[in-house]
A protein has these predicted regions:
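A structural motif corresponding to the C-terminal end of an alpha-helix
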Residues: 60-71, 102-114, 165, 169, ...
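Canonical P-loop GTPase G-domain recognition
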Residues: 74, 82-169
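Switch II (G3) loop of P-loop NTPases
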Residues: 1-18
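C-terminal accessory extensions appended to soluble enzyme cores
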Residues: 142-232
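Short linear functional motifs in flexible/disordered or boundary regions
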Residues: 40-43, 128, 174, 178
Length: 232
């Protein structure tokens, strides 16, 4: 199951909303933190906290360590076309590393693996500029985009990478799990392993897909590692 929810839900005053989010995260295999890249990179990052809710995300995860301990977290910068074309994807990853340092320090203390996996969302357009927003309650500025060439085409890039990282984590966790004492095994993966352990062919096919992981190039970098995930 894949579930998306806005950052505002993390500070919801409705108890059932908070409990729903916590329970979903506690039973998740991987947590994706989407990053609107132009807000991260442009105008000195002035509007980054407002758009990407950096403090809210950081404090929520730190306050709910039991839901994320021993897991995989992917920071996924979106709308990276401009930075790919300008050869600046590594700068995007370094900015993520700098911006979320408090959170990744926390990850390092709690056996949480984290990586940056930038995505080229559309491919045919790229960021151009920021303009004032006229929508009440919206962020102060909105992104303006332009065509990348005369005949822009829909050409997303790197979109399967979060899935490849997820599969890598699942296969690594399965192998790690077999070495643990029964009382130490977490329950959040049980439903997945109930069929993996009985289908070795399926498991081997999953392992083959992990070879497509992009690592240490094109802005794909590790931020923290843990005792479970292994990427060559």
């Amino acid at each position: 199951t894949i579930r998306d929810f806005p950052g505002e839900y993390l500070t919801s005053t409705i108890k059932s909303d908070r409990e729903d989010i916590y329970n979903f995260m506690a039973n998740a295999t991987v947590i994706l933190i989407a990053v609107d890249t132009p807000y991260l990179m442009e105008e000195g990052g002035r509007y980054n906290a407002e758009k990407n809710k950096v403090d809210i995300v950081t404090h929520y995860l730190k306050d709910n360590v039991a839901a994320v301990k021993d897991k995989l977290v992917l920071f996924v910068p979106l709308k990276c076309e401009r930075y790919l074309h300008d050869g600046k994807l590594p700068l995007v990853s370094e900015k993520v590393k700098e911006t979320y340092k408090e959170l990744t320090d926390f990850f390092g203390q709690n056996n949480i693996a984290s990586f940056v996996t930038p995505i080229i969302t559309l491919g045919g357009i790229e960021f151009d500029s920021m303009k004032n927003s006229n929508v009440p309650g919206d962020v102060s500025k909105v992104s303006v985009f332009r065509s990348w060439n005369v005949k822009p085409e829909y050409k997303p890039l790197f979109c399967p990478q979060p899935l490849y990282y997820l599969l890598t984590y699942v296969t690594n966790y399965y192998e790690w799990q077999k070495k643990q004492k029964k009382g130490l095994i977490d329950s959040f993966m049980d439903s997945i392993y109930s069929f993996i352990k009985n289908d070795s062919k399926f498991f081997e096919e999953m392992k083959k897909l992990t070879r497509f992981v992009i690592y240490n190039k094109n802005g794909f970098i590790p931020l923290t590692t843990n005792s479970i995930i292994k990427i060559n």
